[in-house]
Every structure is written in C-alpha cells, then in structure tokens.
C-alpha cells in the first residue's frame, strides 16, 4: 500500500498543504522546526488516530483555527480509498471515507498501515511501561481494528471502577472489605472478562514478535547477542504460558480478590492490563538500565521492524515513516537500517540535512521551509 496524495488544512504549522506522493522513497529535507515531522505525523494519525508526539489532539490544530483536517488517498490492492479526518479538540472527531458522511472514526481504522521510526522510540526501551503497552496495543489495532473497541471498553470499565474505589477510600470503607460496595463485584467481573481478552491478544502478539525482533536486532548489529521479550502480568508473579481466555479470566478474578484490600485503601485499580509491562532483555539482563545508547536504539528499531514484518505478513507492506532517525545512528547502523527498509513499497524520510540520509535511500526529494513543501526537480 502507499499514500498517493496528502492534503492538510490548519494542521500544526500548515494553513494549507497538498502533496503528491508515489511508491518508493520520498525524503523531506529542512531545518528543525520547519514542519517536516508534522507531515509524517499526519500520515501516522490517519493510520492510528493518535500522535506519537502528544497525548491529546489540541496541539494538532493550527493556532487560531477551530479544527484541523487531514485528507489522504490510500492505494491498496489497486483500489484507492479517500480518507478525511476532521480533528475537533473538545468535541468528537469526524471521519469520511470516499466522501461518505456516514462514516465513524473506527470505520477508517485498518485501511492505512504505518510503521513509524522516531527519536521518541528510545522510550520503548528506556521509558515507562505505558510506552511499551502503547506499542503493543497500536500494533494489535493495526492488525485487527476491533481491538480499538476492546481497549475503549476496558478503559471505560477501569474509569468506573477507579471512581468507585476512590469513593470507597474517601469513606474509609477498606476495613469492611468492600462488603458495602456490591457494585464492585460487578466491575471486577467486567474488568476480568474484557481484560482477559486484551491480555490474551497481547500475549499472542509478543510470541509472534519475539523471533522477528531477535532476527532484526541481529541484522542491525551484526552480533549474536540474544534478546527476549517477556510479558509481565500484574495479576501474577509467574510468567504466563497460556492465551486461553477462560484461564486468564480466572487469573484476573483471583488477583482482583487478593488486591481488594489495598485497592480500597488506595482508591485505585492495581491489577489488570493497564499495569502490565513488556520486559525487554538483552544478554539475560534487563535492557532498561543495562543497554548502552547504541544497543537501546538497535533494540527499539528491532521492535519497530518486527511490527513491520508482522503487518507485511498479513498481506500488505505498511508505509514506513522515518522521522529524523538517521541523525541518531552511527554510520554502520544507518547503512543496515537503510538496507532493511528500502524493500518496503513506500518509505517517507525526514532529515535536517541531505547528508543524514543514506545513499541507499535515494528517491523523490522535497524541501520543507516555513510551513511550505516543494518538490525538488
């Protein structure tokens, strides 16, 4: 698949922008702060409905504007889908597919697949567990858009349960073990059922990612250093070896029961997929805290490449977005990454200067300055 056209209105620094793109490599060159990242961010937003840079949509709207609009033409299996997203901070975002007004946001999820490489990826290794949970969940949703609904349902249950626990803590009800809160049992069951579905999907995904990430890490580093991905479940101290949903429901039920006294005291849910982590190991040591800067970069890139290979195996090459990544890498890692990604159907690269882009990634070149984009001839 590839994006053939991108149009922006009041998105970030762009009052208006229109790009014609093509398969292969396209490079966007310009000084920092001129809007290069905004372009790949917009394409990523079409795929995931989220930004890799900010947690909320408000910064995506140009200062002084009420809304932002992204329009993208996505070519897949010879067919073109026209996607329009209207970003409305403080209100519901809106979507159109092939100009139809009767389109829900979830209807356009899964049409465009992207894999983004960005300086923020270092947080996959060095950051908090939330970064790694987001990595897994975004990949799950890209492969099976219905998981967007599962995640939304889980977050709704979690919010309601936390509100109940917070109220119980304020009333000092923990000494009664929650007997005055019969609805807590109801929310426990909801959390166990929906949480088990999300947990099973994550566990299966990690099992698929493991060999692909190990292969990619070896190719990026030219070493035999072993890496392993281990899913750390907050409901048990043991490493889970099952994706059987009924078994996972029972594990979560038991963990919620054990945690109830502490949860009632603290007023917050302490067990569930929202507290889990994807632990990254290198040479039988936790990568977080032990891996060097170069090893951490290679690990983060290996995770992204593993995600790319999974999406490719599902039937389509995702669009690769490389945002100022090469400036962070030494010459050998640049060369190895470029050799790996150039086989993709479409690769979009941003860089401050042309020398940051490896020669292996030659193709169309755009100059980005002051919120305008022009193709070099």
UniProtKB/Swiss-Prot annotation:
Q: Which domain of life is it from?
A: Bacteria
| Residues the record lists as binding ATP | 30-37
Q: List, alphabetically, the Pfam families matched.
A: SMC_N (PF02463)
Keywords annotated in UniProt: ATP-binding, Cytoplasm, DNA damage, DNA repair, DNA replication, DNA-binding, Nucleotide-binding, SOS response
Kindly list the places in or outside the cell where this protein is found, as annotated in its UniProt entry. Answer: Cytoplasm
* Any one GO MF annotation of this record: single-stranded DNA binding
Protein name per Swiss-Prot or TrEMBL: DNA replication and repair protein RecF
- Gene Ontology annotations of biological process type: DNA replication; DNA synthesis involved in DNA repair; double-strand break repair; SOS response
Main role? The RecF protein is involved in DNA metabolism; it is required for DNA replication and normal SOS inducibility. RecF binds preferentially to single-stranded, linear DNA. It also seems to bind ATP.
Q: Coiled-coil ranges per the record?
A: none
What GO CC terms are in its UniProt record? cytoplasm
Gene behind this protein: recF
Q: Name the protein family.
A: Belongs to the RecF family.
- Species of provenance: Thermobifida fusca (strain YX)
């Amino acid at each position: 698949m590839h994006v053939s056209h991108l149009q922006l209105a009041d998105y970030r620094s762009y009052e208006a922008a229109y790009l014609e793109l093509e398969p292969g490599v396209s490079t966007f060159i310009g000084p920092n702060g001129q809007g290069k990242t905004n372009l790949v961010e917009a394409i990523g937003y079409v795929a995931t409905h989220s930004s890799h840079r900010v947690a909320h949509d408000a910064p995506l709207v140009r200062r002084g504007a009420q809304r932002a609009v992204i329009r993208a033409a996505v070519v897949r299996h010879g067919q073109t889908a026209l996607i329009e997203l209207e970003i409305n901070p403080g209100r519901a975002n809106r979507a159109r597919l092939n100009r139809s007004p009767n389109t829900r946001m979830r209807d356009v999820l899964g049409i465009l697949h992207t894999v983004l490489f960005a300086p923020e990826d270092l947080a996959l290794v060095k950051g908090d567990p939330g970064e790694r949970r987001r990595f897994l969940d975004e990949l799950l949703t890209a492969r099976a858009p219905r998981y967007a609904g599962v995640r939304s349902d889980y977050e709704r249950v979690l919010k309601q349960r936390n509100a109940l626990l917070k109220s119980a803590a304020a009333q000092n009800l923990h000494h009664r073990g929650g007997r005055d809160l019969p609805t807590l049992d109801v929310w426990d069951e909801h959390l166990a059922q929906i949480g088990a579905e999300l947990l099973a999907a994550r566990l299966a995904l990690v099992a698929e990612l493991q060999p692909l990430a190990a292969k990619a890490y070896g190719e990026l580093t030219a070493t035999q250093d072993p890496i392993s991905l281990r899913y750390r479940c907050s409901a048990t101290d043991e490493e889970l070896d099952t994706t059987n949903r009924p078994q996972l429901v029972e594990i979560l039920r038991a963990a919620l029961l054990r945690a109830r006294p502490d949860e009632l005291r603290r007023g917050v849910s302490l067990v569930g997929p929202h507290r889990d982590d994807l632990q990254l190991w290198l040479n039988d040591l936790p990568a977080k805290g032990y891996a060097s800067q170069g090893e951490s970069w290679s690990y983060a890139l290996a995770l992204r490449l593993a995600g790319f290979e999974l999406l490719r195996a599902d039937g389509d090459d995702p669009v690769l977005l490389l945002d100022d990544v090469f400036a962070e890498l030494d010459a050998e890692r640049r060369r190895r990454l470029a050799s790996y990604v150039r086989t993709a159907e479409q690769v979009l690269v941003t860089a401050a200067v042309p020398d940051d882009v490896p020669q292996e990634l030659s193709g169309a070149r755009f100059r980005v300055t002051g919120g305008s984009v022009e193709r070099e001839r």
